[in-house]
């Protein structure tokens, strides 16, 4: 049985090289309270042992001066993503592609988990549509 509700170390976007490529050459869109950056690529160009979906999250210091607040928001976003990423992973596996994904929180107040969960669902549905469009 595959563990589908996990967000392990290999699924986190931490490589400086990949982050630079994502912000320079990737596509982006906004859906409050997120700014989403992503790059779609085919499986053949990348290493075979990497997961199909790699994820990162950031919260700016402009609106949240305290690290405690930034870390709480990042934890909430990671949890909302972890519980809803399965459809996106299945779609990428079916298409034979992979995606680097980075969320930047653009809100000005600490959100409730239910608010983030709903908006994460909408953003992931938009990403599914973009995957379908790119493989047509």
Each model region followed by its residue ranges:
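Positively charged, solvent-exposed patches that mediate nucleic-acid binding
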Residues: 1-136
